[in-house]
Amino acid sequence: MQMFPPSPLFFFLQLLKQSSRRLEHTFVFLRNFSLMLLRYIGKKRRATRFWDPRRGTP
């Protein structure tokens, strides 16, 4: 059985698969991080709106 050298297309497809998986992980992490950040900012904004230091104690 003769062994053929792997084609550049095969290497390219493998690289594309790996990079797309990495990009997917990055995007998922960014989405989760931004959601947490938005939730934190929303809670903080809500808290400052409820407990405004100019009005004194809540």
Swiss-Prot record:
Induction: By testosterone. It comes from the Eukaryota. Detected at low levels in the ductal cells of the salivary gland but not in the acinar cells (at protein level). Expressed in endometrium (at protein level). Expressed in epithelial cells within the acinar ducts of the prostate. It holds the Pfam family TARP. InterPro entries: TARP. Encoded in an alternative reading frame of the T-cell receptor gamma chain gene which is composed of variable (Vgamma), joining (Jgamma), and constant (Cgamma) gene segments. Originates within an intron directly upstream of the Jgamma1.2 gene segment and contains three exons from the Cgamma1 segment. This is T-cell receptor gamma alternate reading frame protein. It comes from Homo sapiens. The gene is TRGC1.
